[in-house]
Amino acid sequence: MEVERSKKDDDLNNGSKSNEEEEISVERIFEESNEIPPPWQKQLTFRALIVSFILAILFTFVVMKLNLTTGIIPSLNISAGLLGFFFVKSWTKILNKAGFLKQPFTRQENTVIQTCVVASSGIAFSGGFGSYLFGMSDVVAKQSAEANTPLNIKNPHLGWMIGFLFVVSFLGLFSVVPLRKIMIVDFKLTYPSGTATAHLINSFHTPQGAKLAKKQVRALGKFFSFSFLWGFFQWFFATGDGCGFANFPTFGLKAYENKFYFDFSATYVGVGMICPYLINVSLLIGAILSWGVMWPLIGAQKGKWYAADLSSTSLHGLQGYRVFIAIAMILGDGLYNFIKVLGRTVFGLYKQFKNKDVLPINDHTSTAPVTISYDDKRRTELFLKDRIPSWFAVTGYVVLAIVSIITVPHIFHQLKWYHILIMYIIAPVLAFCNAYGCGLTDWSLASTYGKLAIFTIGAWAGASNGGVLAGLAACGVMMNIVSTASDLMQDFKTGYMTLASPRSMFLSQAIGTAMGCVISPCVFWLFYKAFPDFGQPGTAYPAPYALVYRNMSILGVEGFSALPKHCLMLCYIFFAAAVIVNGIRDALGPKWARFIPLPMAMAIPFYLGGYFTIDMCLGSLILFIWRKLNKPKADAYSSAVASGLICGEGIWTLPSSILALAGVKAPICMKFLSMASNNKVDAFLNPS
């Protein structure tokens, strides 16, 4: 998620073209087919909410699995829109044949479904189940020698997780509602992902688009079935740790020891097909640099740089270098992009207010005529028709803030009411900055704002007052506000271009958020209870960012004294390198920047290893060859095929979790041994 929330699919963005460039008016096409947008109450249909709920569960399992394995989560907007179209279209077709169809399926209803599903599954990310929230647990605390006292530990429980999410997840929705007209109509911000999703939904509801959508759904279904059955087949051979296809030493046992192998994950092959080539190559370069060069060299200093008798998971040993150097690169990349996007935001606002002709508050008219397309006129007219009153947004924010200020300190005693009050005072400004920056660059910095809260609130609370837990809880409060704010504005852009009412979009986002506040904790709880080694390094679900976030909080509270020898110097070097590499990328421009790796992507395998990068690079290779052989077909179907691969294996986690809870284990352990180890096993089993 750290990568994919920031770096969107290049193909998705390339499809985000402004309506001024369109030769044919989209809205005239729909008017010729006698489509009249229904009132906002009829856009929020019962069938739309039922389909949204089903898809929300599906996508939450997918996002949760990705969150707890590597933390890399691709955009699922296309999948949500496509499956929403398929389910409701099938529903209406059956009812129409039976003579019970009361309302046709519209693009506005399709937009409502997509918004609700993405809002719900988004809680699996912003809820921190793979980062700050699970980082509070004793499972993660035991992996660090510092701050693992009861004051800095809070184990997951369904009750407080659901309650916490309900009191912090809705404020972001109210914080930017009054600014929707300024952002969408006056500033005409692009919101590339929202625009691309709108183009997709509009295309579904044309005759040619409907035919293509059916073929895409068919392709998605085929690869969903393959991925699900492949996950089921693999389960039979993985009865214990180190068993199964996921531990196949593809490049030899030495490479396997250094985390270089193909683990036969259909999910990450699909993720690789969606992620841009540059991200996948950056991940591979990071894996080679760390596990191929750095860690073997630092490991050779065992007994000199760190004690030789430390366990492999001790942060005072080699694991400390892996975790803290990765943190340094993530912080360097995050700080650079925070300053860059903030600078663009301030400069963009300066230009907007300097050129007052674009603002409706100006009484003077421009001498130069401004050409407004028919589509823009029609969309603006309907977008401004169903207003959401500013008093409603302000009242909602204040009431929810008061409830949160009272409630959250009862959940986290270390986080005081005045900490939350200060965050809620500055949060609307940060939410606006994030929403505006996202509109310009498609770049959400929600996790960066969360890290700022970790350091500031954690240091303010202090080590003796549970500052580590306070920092992690503050991260959750801040992340949920700024993340939902930018998501809502993206959805407003989608609604603007599909003629969906802002009221139906707001309510859909709110309903989806409420669904996510229940579904995500329940799905996480299933993982947490089903797998005894959950959260441990080297297991099926290591939750890598949980340890990263906890150690960020420890650094903010206790400083650098706990780092192993020379680790701080290496952290400084890689922090600076991340800033410099980003600076070089921006200085060279897009033409050459595509050949320079992304520091954020390089940092992820520093801690995890290179096994998932092999899967993702294979996905890129498949897409590259497919495009060479048949580019139009690849562009039309690659997202559907990738989504099928991701969702199929993701959904297999539900039955596998239920089997684990029931105590049912796989019958076979398939392991790979060296010749020497195999001879020892044979001698033990067959003594002569």
From Swiss-Prot:
Entry membrane topology: Multi-pass membrane protein
Main location: membrane
Pfam family, one: OPT
Transmembrane segments: 48-68, 71-91, 116-136, 158-178, 219-239, 278-298, 323-343, 392-412, 420-440, 452-472, 506-526, 560-580, 606-626, 644-664
InterPro entries, sorted: OPT, YSL-like
Coiled-coil region list: none
A cellular component annotation (GO) from this entry: membrane
Compartmental location: Membrane
Gene Ontology molecular function terms on file: oligopeptide transmembrane transporter activity
UniProt keyword annotations, A-Z: Membrane, Transmembrane, Transmembrane helix, Transport
Annotated spans, Disordered: 1-26
Listed Basic and acidic residues bias regions: 1-11
NCBIfam families in the record: OPT_sfam
UniProt record similarity statement: Belongs to the YSL (TC 2.A.67.2) family.
Function: May be involved in the transport of nicotianamine-chelated metals.
Name the UniProt record assigns to this protein: Probable metal-nicotianamine transporter YSL7
Organism encoding this protein: Arabidopsis thaliana
Gene name tied to this protein: YSL7
